[in-house]
C-alpha cells in the first residue's frame, strides 16, 4: 500500500455543520486505522492548522464541512503548508460552495439547471413569484446540509422568507420547484458511481431527513431510473464536476421532473461519510466497502 505517512483527519471546524463533520471524521478515522494507516483526529477549532507541520503530519484527509472547510479556505492553508490533502483544490472548492456561481457556470456550459433568481432587498418579489411559480424553493447560496432551505407555497410569502434567511452565508436564491424525484450521483476519481434515488419521509430531503430520521429511503441502484437515465445521470455528474474543476470524491445532486428530464441541483465537493451518507451507499453497490473507499479517497491527496 502507498505510504501516506502520518495522516491528519481534519474534522469539526467552525461551521454550522460541525457535528456532521465530527461524525464523518470519526468514521473515517476508524476506517483508516483498520487499514493500518497512522491516522489521527485534528480539529482546527481546537488546534491551529499551523500545528500540522509541527506535529509531523504528512497527509490530510479533509472532511471539514461548510465555511472554512470546503470553501477553499483550508485548502489554501494546506497549499501554503505544502501538505497533500484530499478533495478539490482552492478554486473548485470555492465555486462548489457557492450555489449561485456554480449554477451560472453550469448554465453557461449548457448543463440543465432549474430556473432560478437571486434575491436582494430591492427585488420585485411578486415578479419572481410570477416568473418561477409556486411552490418554489428558497435557499442560501453558501450553506450545506439543506441548512436554511425553505419551500415557499403561499402567494406573497417570498419576501418574508427572504428576510428570515438573508443573514445566512452568501446570496439567497429562489429556485423553480421540480416536481419529480430527488437523486444523487457520486463521482470518484472522475468516474460516476451508481445514482441513488432519495425518497424522504419528510416533504423534501431536508436536514431532518438527512441526519435525524431512519425512515428516509435510499434506493441504489435506483428502481425508477432506466439504464439510459442512469447512464445520463453519471455523465452529467462527471461533466458537472469537471466544469468547476472538482476532483477526488464529490457528489452531484439531481432532480428529475415528471417528464423524465434531469436537472443538476448542486455539487458537494466534500460529501459526508456518516452512516446516513450517500457516497458509501453508492460505492457499496460496486463492491467497495467503507474502509476501502476511504483508502481510495486518501490516494487522491494532492497539492496544487
Curated annotation (Swiss-Prot):
Cofactors, names only: Mg(2+); Mn(2+)
GO CC annotations, alphabetized: cytoplasm
UniProt entry tagged with the keyword Ribosomal protein: no
Domain ATP-grasp per the UniProt entry, residue ranges: 103-299
UniProt superkingdom: Bacteria
Note on how the cofactor is bound: Binds 2 magnesium or manganese ions per subunit.
Alphabetized InterPro entries for the sequence: ATP-grasp, ATP_grasp_subdomain_1, D-Ala_lig_Van_CS, D_ala_D_ala, Dala_Dala_lig_C, Dala_Dala_lig_N, PreATP-grasp_dom_sf
Catalyzed reactions: 2 D-alanine + ATP = D-alanyl-D-alanine + ADP + phosphate + H(+)
GO terms (BP aspect): cell wall organization; peptidoglycan biosynthetic process; regulation of cell shape
Chain residues that bind Mg(2+) 1: 253, 266
Pathway(s): Cell wall biogenesis; peptidoglycan biosynthesis
EC numbers: 6.3.2.4
Binding site for ATP: 129-184
Keyword Magnesium in record: yes
Pfam families: Dala_Dala_lig_C, Dala_Dala_lig_N
Protein keywords: ATP-binding, Cell shape, Cell wall biogenesis/degradation, Cytoplasm, Ligase, Magnesium, Manganese, Metal-binding, Nucleotide-binding, Peptidoglycan synthesis
HAMAP family in alphabetical order: Dala_Dala_lig
Function: Cell wall formation.
Name of the protein this chain belongs to: D-alanine--D-alanine ligase
Gene behind the chain: ddl
Amino acid at each position: 500500500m502507498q505510504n501516506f505517512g502520518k495522516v491528519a483527519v481534519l474534522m469539526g471546524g467552525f461551521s454550522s455543520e460541525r457535528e456532521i463533520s465530527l461524525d464523518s471524521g470519526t468514521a473515517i478515522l476508524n476506517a483508516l486505522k483498520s487499514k493500518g494507516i497512522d491516522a489521527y483526529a485534528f480539529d482546527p477549532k481546537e488546534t491551529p492548522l499551523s500545528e500540522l507541520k509541527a506535529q509531523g503530519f504528512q497527509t490530510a484527509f479533509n472532511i471539514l464541512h461548510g465555511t472554512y472547510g470546503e470553501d477553499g479556505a483550508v485548502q489554501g492553508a494546506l497549499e501554503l503548508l505544502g501538505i497533500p490533502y484530499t478533495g478539490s483544490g482552492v478554486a473548485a472548492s470555492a465555486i462548489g460552495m457557492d450555489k449561485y456561481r456554480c449554477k451560472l457556470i453550469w448554465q453557461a456550459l449548457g448543463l440543465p439547471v432549474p430556473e432560478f433568481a437571486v434575491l436582494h432587498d430591492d427585488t420585485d418579489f411578486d415578479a419572481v413569484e410570477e416568473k418561477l411559480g409556486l411552490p418554489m424553493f428558497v435557499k442560501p447560496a453558501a450553506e450545506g446540509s439543506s441548512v436554511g432551505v425553505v419551500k415557499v407555497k403561499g402567494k406573497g410569502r417570498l419576501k418574508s422568507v427572504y428576510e428570515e434567511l438573508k443573514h445566512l452565508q452568501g446570496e439567497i436564491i429562489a429556485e423553480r420547484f421540480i416536481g419529480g424525484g430527488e437523486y444523487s450521483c457520486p463521482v470518484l476519481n472522475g468516474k460516476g458511481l451508481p445514482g441513488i434515488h432519495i425518497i424522504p419521509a419528510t416533504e423534501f430531503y431536508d436536514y431532518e431527513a438527512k441526519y435525524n430520521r431512519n425512515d428516509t429511503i435510499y434506493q441504489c441502484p435506483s428502481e425508477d431510473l432506466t439504464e439510459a437515465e442512469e447512464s445520463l445521470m453519471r455523465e452529467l455528474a462527471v461533466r458537472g464536476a469537471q466544469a468547476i474543476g472538482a476532483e477526488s470524491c464529490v457528489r452531484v445532486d439531481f432532480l428529475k421532473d415528471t417528464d423524465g428530464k434531469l436537472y443538476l441541483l448542486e455539487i458537494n465537493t466534500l460529501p459526508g461519510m456518516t452512516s446516513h451518507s450517500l457516497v458509501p451507499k453508492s460505492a457499496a453497490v460496486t463492491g467497495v466497502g467503507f474502509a476501502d473507499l476511504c483508502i481510495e479517497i486518501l490516494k487522491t491527496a494532492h497539492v496544487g
